[in-house]
Amino acid sequence: MPACRTLRAMHALFPCLLLLAAFTTSAREVAAPAEHVDADGPYVFVTAKGHEAAWICNDHIVHRTLPARGDTTQVVPECGYPHPVTVLPPRTAEVAQYPATPRIVAVSDIHGHYDLLVRLLRAHHVIDARDEWSLGDATLVVAGDVFDRGPQVTEAFWLLYGLQQQARAAGGAVHFVLGNHETMVLYDDLRYVNPKYLRSAQLLGRSYPALYGPDSVIGQWLRTRPVMLRIGDTLFLHGGIAPENLDLVRGMDATNATYQAAVGLPRDQVKAAPDTARLFDGKTSPIWYRGYFDGQLDTAQVDALLTQLDLARIVVGHTSMPHVSTFHGDQIIAIDSSIKNGENGELLFIEDGLLSRGLLDGSRLPLAEGKIGLED
């Protein structure tokens, strides 16, 4: 620290600030469980006889054994998520490369703010007043990070789970791409978990990651989600692709399969194994990379990267912005619009190659011009 005190130029403080930030992050502790949970659930688990569902209602557990009806199971709400849920049989990992589609809507980093997400999707007629899919044959992409921070993680996951079914029936699609917070929670890094969920886990007699284990419906769903998704000439992922990792995009199917196989494994194990270490690297992996925004790459380097991958643009979350923003001549689009703060948020629209952002009041504007160095 003496070296920091002797620095005279403001820009020279940057390494020290990074050191302080790293110390602060590593020192963050898991919160104590909340004293009371008003409403949470359902948590639906696969059993030998079908499904079991559990809710926390007024800090008490409600259990239901759910009979199957053919291939599906219906879950009627008790508290928590307010809509009925149709549980489908587990699906194998879906294809993560699709042809171009005329209309794509994208959002990321919901972080437990279900109510805000619903307001945003309703404002742009992605869902109707009953929170059901109303975008026809269009596509919705959610670029990671439903877990952590906010108090409505469970509701957000079930909304996306149901919308995926409804969109498919209408000829559209909903895609969820894994973020770093999905990885963190499932390998038991609980530093950002809302205290509500630690209380829910306590009442249900499971660890929080076990509520999303391989025997849970949402846990199974998460384990079949990709870490990167290509639609036409647009790549969607949570963090970004570092120049040294272009082969991960070229071998996208193998990359996604490796991630999916590693979801829920202990952190030390995935970071030590040669085939997964760089996929979980805290600086350069697809779920953590921030190099498009901190000056590591200039526009010429970004252009070269996209040319090698035959892409028009890369759409990422992870790095928080005040608005959906464009960088490097519309080649990098940052869609983490700080929904995590629970106050505002925006959607990205890609319509026949034209880009715009949708605001909470239902209006549309051009993308904001991003500023290099703005990083969270």
Task: Give the label of every model feature segment.
Residues 1-8:
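N-terminal secretory signal peptides that target proteins for export/translocation
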Residues 8-17:
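Sec-dependent signal peptide recognition
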Residues 17-26:
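Hydrophobic h-region of N-terminal signal peptides that target proteins for export
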Residues 26-376:
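Feature recognizes metal-dependent phosphohydrolase scaffolds
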